[in-house]
Amino acid sequence: MGSRSSHAAVIPDGDSIRRETGFSQASLLRLHHRFRALDRNKKGYLSRMDLQQIGALAVNPLGDRIIESFFPDGSQRVDFPGFVRVLAHFRPVEDEDTETQDPKKPEPLNSRRNKLHYAFQLYDLDRDGKISRHEMLQVLRLMVGVQVTEEQLENIADRTVQEADEDGDGAVSFVEFTKSLEKMDVEQKMSIRILK
């Protein structure tokens, strides 16, 4: 029992980060260990180059977009709390996440809505709150590469935007994006199991 509080002291603001992200103490300690391993020069923060060392991101077609999500507003570094906040979007939804939700508190970072918002931002390259045909095409190019012809990609982008675009403005808003994915199990598809 005493070891739990001594481990918490290793992570500055550990209890606050745990409450905000929903990670267990054990998961938070593992993430802190991973953060320190990525921070090879012991700077206390990570750069884009540090995150590019993560193999799963290096082979992910959206890896660069995911890495960018760690650096909001053009910042050049991410500290441990920021690192964990981004990763919290990928934390699987547990039964206790929905059972104990206080309506006065902010929605958990791993809620369906927050997972969808995170995914939406990966597509909304210019951050204007809409996914245009051009943005959809850019993301599709990243995801399929040369396996599909340019004409096929353009057709897929056109069809995807047309199917989701309910107001006819030629782009997909967050509300439209959410509606188009209502039948998808986003909670599980956007989850990475982190050992407890």
From Swiss-Prot:
Listed under GO cellular component are:
cytoplasm; cytosol; nucleolus; nucleoplasm; nucleus; plasma membrane
Q: Which CDD domains match?
A: EFh (cd00051)
Sites binding Ca(2+) 2 sit at 165, 167, 169, 176
In chain numbering, motif Nuclear export signal lies across 137-148
Q: What does this protein do?
A: Functions as an integral cofactor in cell pH regulation by controlling plasma membrane-type Na(+)/H(+) exchange activity. Binds to and activates SLC9A1/NHE1 in a serum-independent manner, thus increasing pH and protecting cells from serum deprivation-induced death. Also plays a role in the regulation of cell proliferation and tumor growth by increasing the phosphatase activity of PPP3CA in a calcium-dependent manner. Activator of the calcineurin/NFAT signaling pathway. Involved in the cytoplasmic translocation of the transcription factor NFATC3 to the nucleus.
Question: What's the protein called, per UniProt?
Answer: Calcineurin B homologous protein 2
Q: Signal among the record's keywords? A: no
Primary location group: nucleus
* Disulphide connectivity of cysteines: none
Presence of the UniProt keyword Nucleus in the record: yes
Q: What is the effect of changing residue 135 to A?
A: Reduces calcium-binding. Inhibits calcium-binding and cell membrane localization
- Describe the family membership recorded for this protein in Swiss-Prot or TrEMBL: Belongs to the calcineurin regulatory subunit family. CHP subfamily.
Give start-end ranges for the coiled-coil region(s): none
List each copy of the EF-hand domain by range.
26-61, 71-106, 111-146, 152-187
* UniProt-listed Pfam families: EF-hand_5 (PF13202), EF-hand_7 (PF13499)
